[in-house]
């Protein structure tokens, strides 16, 4: 299915000697220190002057928007005499950008040996991974800062706001109401277990009572429609890949309780995670038995949970690995209900009953000619024997465990404590996130447009939209022009690629309606939610139900081409193949990615790279299967298809040969990360060329104070610094298994090793690590 993708970028150039050069940073450090001090003093005076006055509602790091720029003439070292001298920008915005870049760098490292260490060594040295984090990166820092803003606006109750916003604040307060959560203990969970047909391991005589009337179809439908848990069979509604103007029912293999199927087999660290997972299950069931005044019966609990783990292990074996699911055309099988039933009988499983029961929750009736799309054919073929092997008790224990697993965070501390060892084995962390951050994240992910409206009002300058739109036009134009360089693609395919690129629609910042006070759409979006400050667990169940049913209703609704696929308060960017649409939420439109107060070299190397990355997703190993209208269609000639695969194989091999010390020397999965690597490489290449074109057409950029770097060098340094970050070993191992992105370090090294322009810019001799003898290129 055409899923949304995340952000990334890439570029090219070739070079000269690898001898040690004079430091890029020498000579300007004293000036920079004085400027930073002056800027901070000026800010202090400004702040003191405004105390007591009403300040604008614009907050946070996106500041100095109206400042006057002041410039000092200076000729950077190493630039030919004939080249025009650039102006040095000394505004607070530029000084802060210079300080950030300087602090993040490690000038003792040779850029041609390890550019990631050169660009990020200072950042890595200064930042220790917080106890609550499994990874800590520039992205995480920006998210932390964004959450501080959200905390302030969610806790602000001085004035009555619109209903959607008030509901978000009520949900936040219920999450923060820890005294009530502790007082209620496990009772909210025990109450809901009765609704779902009981958890056999945590009750007596299930087999002889509730179990006698148990039906798999109805249980799966209940989990799907009321709790948004698509267990055993993943049924969901989405745009039809072959006709993006309509929605259709999809049937696919499900997710599992642990992040990757690989954790269910093999030894080493996988065994440790498995053992911790089993103990987690046993501990939760034991607590619930105690609270229900039942005997501990540790033998029964252990036996039941071992059976659950065995069942889930068989399900894991039945699933197809992600690296074998990249060809969406091969995955897609549309059929009627009769064919579905005849092909996948599952020992009497009634597909029509299951699907109709799910849809009945939103009062939708199946049509006689209703079609479904089956993605998970190999899984469904294997599922029949699994269902036949395990008892109703074990299957029900598993279904309810998946609901319980999802809701542990909504319960009292004693339940959270049961997952400590599991989280340590999986993420390397033993300390829970501070409560307010957990609650901010929860509310933002469940009420993204309500929270987004608060964030945009507080921290997003509206004029950013037009500037980003101009950057999109520039990068897209370069993508189209660059098609002429591709010898592996014939003219017919290039023409269709050009048409698709020019048809990509963009969404920037936020949907307009979330700020329109007279537009009731935002309030109507959450009209079915009614929260109580004392009922956090029940509030979370409401969100699950409303989310599930909002999705199910789409089956009979027209596809809205203007629908936003993500909220505004998000530090990320996305591409949707079904919509041929790129999205840049307000949360990512801030330094180091973007600011009107920093040189364009940084903007092109930041958000420009992200723009190129998302555009390139339309032509990666998944996006290439969709046409300009978002319909799955093979618009490629046989010649171009064959050569695309050959170009891609180069990248699969390149990234697959990176051995990651943090992940027990495991290699990056070149197959799983192919789409993101293609986008990274294409994104930085296009952004760099767009920057050079902008300058060639008369664009005047400024130098940053204290940094004797060319504009081109600043571009690449800012690109690399976007990815500064470090991992805990446990999470590194998990990332190798589950993340479709390469590790941060290899996102930088891999893309820049493939760019001749980078080697030229830093004068890297052929044969040095950053100027390899062979390079890969797709776009």
Swiss-Prot record:
Membrane topology summary: Single-pass type II membrane protein
Location of the active site: 614, 680 (proton donor)
GO molecular function: endopeptidase activity; metal ion binding; metalloendopeptidase activity
Pfam families per UniProt: Peptidase_M13, Peptidase_M13_N
Class of enzymatic activity (EC top level): hydrolase
Regulation of catalytic or functional activity: Inhibited by thiorphan and phosphoramidon.
Domain Peptidase M13: 88-779
Keywords: Coiled coil, Disulfide bond, Glycoprotein, Hydrolase, Membrane, Metal-binding, Metalloprotease, Protease, Secreted, Signal-anchor, Transmembrane, Transmembrane helix, Zinc
Gene Ontology annotations of biological process type: protein processing; proteolysis
Cofactor note: Binds 1 zinc ion per subunit.
Residues annotated as binding a peptide: 135
Family of the protein in this entry: Belongs to the peptidase M13 family.
Functional description taken from the UniProt entry: Metalloprotease involved in sperm function, possibly by modulating the processes of fertilization and early embryonic development. Degrades a broad variety of small peptides with a preference for peptides shorter than 3 kDa containing neutral bulky aliphatic or aromatic amino acid residues. Shares the same substrate specificity with MME and cleaves peptides at the same amide bond.
Protein name as annotated: Membrane metallo-endopeptidase-like 1
Gene this chain is encoded by: MMEL1
């Amino acid at each position: 299915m055409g899923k949304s993708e995340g952000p990334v970028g890439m570029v090219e150039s070739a070079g000269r000697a690898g001898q040690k050069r004079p430091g890029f940073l020498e000579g300007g450090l004293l000036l920079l220190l004085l400027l930073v001090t002056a800027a901070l003093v000026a800010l202090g005076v400004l702040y003191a002057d405004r105390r007591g006055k009403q300040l604008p509602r614009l907050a946070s790091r996106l500041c100095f928007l109206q400042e006057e720029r002041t410039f000092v003439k200076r000729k950077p070292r190493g630039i030919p005499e004939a080249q025009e001298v650039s102006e040095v920008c000394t505004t607070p915005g530029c000084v802060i950008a210079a300080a950030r870049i300087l602090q993040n760098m490690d000038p003792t490292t040779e850029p041609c040996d390890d550019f990631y260490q050169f660009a990020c060594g200072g950042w890595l040295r200064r930042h220790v991974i917080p106890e609550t984090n499994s990874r800590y990166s520039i992205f995480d820092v920006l998210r932390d800062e964004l959450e501080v803003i959200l905390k302030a606006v969610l806790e602000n109750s001085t004035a009555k706001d619109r209903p959607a916003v008030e509901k978000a604040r009520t949900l936040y307060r219920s999450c923060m109401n820890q005294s009530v959560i502790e007082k209620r203990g496990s009772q909210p969970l025990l109450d809901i277990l009765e609704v779902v047909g009981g958890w056999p391991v945590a009750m007596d005589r299930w087999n002889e009572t509730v179990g006698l009337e148990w039906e798999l179809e109805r249980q799966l439908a209940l989990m799907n429609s009321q709790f948004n848990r698509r267990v055993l069979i993943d049924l969901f509604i989405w745009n039809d890949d072959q006709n993006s103007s309509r929605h259709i029912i999809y049937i696919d293999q499900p997710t599992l309780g642990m992040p990757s199927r690989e954790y269910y087999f093999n030894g080493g660290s996988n065994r440790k995670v498995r053992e911790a997972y089993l103990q987690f299950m046993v501990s939760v069931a034991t607590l619930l038995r105690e609270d229900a005044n039942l005997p501990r019966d540790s033998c029964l609990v252990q036996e039941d949970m071992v059976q659950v783990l065995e069942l889930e292990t068989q399900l894991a074996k039945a699933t197809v690995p992600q690296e074998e699911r990249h060809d969406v055309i091969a995955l897609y099988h549309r059929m009627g209900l009769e064919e579905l039933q005849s092909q996948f009988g599952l020992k009497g499983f009634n597909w029509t009953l299951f699907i109709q029961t799910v849809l009945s929750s939103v009062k939708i009736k199946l049509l006689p000619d209703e079609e479904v799309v089956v993605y998970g054919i190999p899984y469904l073929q294997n599922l029949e024997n699994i269902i036949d092997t395990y008892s109703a008790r074990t299957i029900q224990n598993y279904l309810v465990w998946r609901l319980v697993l999802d809701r542990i965070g909504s319960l009292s501390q004693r339940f959270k404590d049961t997952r400590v060892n599991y989280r340590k084995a999986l993420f390397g962390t033993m300390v829970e996130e501070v409560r307010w951050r957990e609650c901010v994240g929860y509310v933002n992910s469940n009420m993204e447009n309500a929270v987004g409206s608060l964030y945009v009002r507080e921290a997003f300058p509206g004029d950013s939209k037009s500037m980003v739109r101009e950057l999109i036009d520039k990068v897209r134009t370069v993508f189209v022009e660059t098609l002429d360089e591709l010898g592996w693609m014939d003219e017919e395919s290039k023409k269709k690629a050009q048409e698709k690129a020019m048809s990509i629609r963009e969404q920037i910042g936020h949907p307009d309606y979330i700020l329109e006070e007279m537009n009731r759409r935002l309030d109507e979006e959450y009209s079915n939610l009614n929260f109580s400050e004392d009922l956090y667990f029940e509030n979370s169940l409401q969100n699950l139900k409303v989310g599930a049913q909002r999705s199910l209703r789409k089956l009979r609704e027209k596809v809205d081409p203007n629908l936003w696929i993500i909220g505004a308060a998000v530090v990320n960017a996305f591409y949707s193949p079904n919509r041929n649409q790129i999205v840049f939420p307000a949360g990512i439109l801030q330094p180091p990615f973007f600011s009107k107060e920093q040189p364009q070299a940084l903007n092109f190397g930041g958000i420009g790279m992200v723009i190129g990355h998302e555009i390139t997703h339309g032509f990666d190993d998944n996006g290439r299967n969709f046409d300009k209208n978002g319909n799955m269609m093979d618009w490629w000639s046989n010649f171009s298809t064959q050569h695309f695969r050959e170009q891609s194989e180069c990248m699969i091999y390149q990234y697959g040969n990176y051995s990651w010390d943090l992940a027990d020397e495991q290699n990056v999965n070149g197959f799983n990360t192919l789409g993101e690597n293609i986008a990274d490489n294409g994104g930085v290449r296009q952004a760099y060329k767009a920057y050079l074109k902008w300058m060639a057409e008369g664009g005047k950029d400024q130098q940053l104070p204290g940094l004797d770097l060319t504009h081109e060098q600043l571009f690449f340094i800012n690109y690399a610094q976007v990815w500064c970050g470090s991992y805990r070993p446990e999470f590194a191992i998990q990332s190798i298994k589950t993340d479709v992105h390469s590790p941060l370090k290899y996102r930088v090294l891999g893309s820049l090793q493939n760019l001749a322009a980078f080697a030229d810019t830093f004068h890297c001799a052929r044969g040095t690590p950053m100027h390899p003898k062979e390079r890969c290129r797709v776009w």
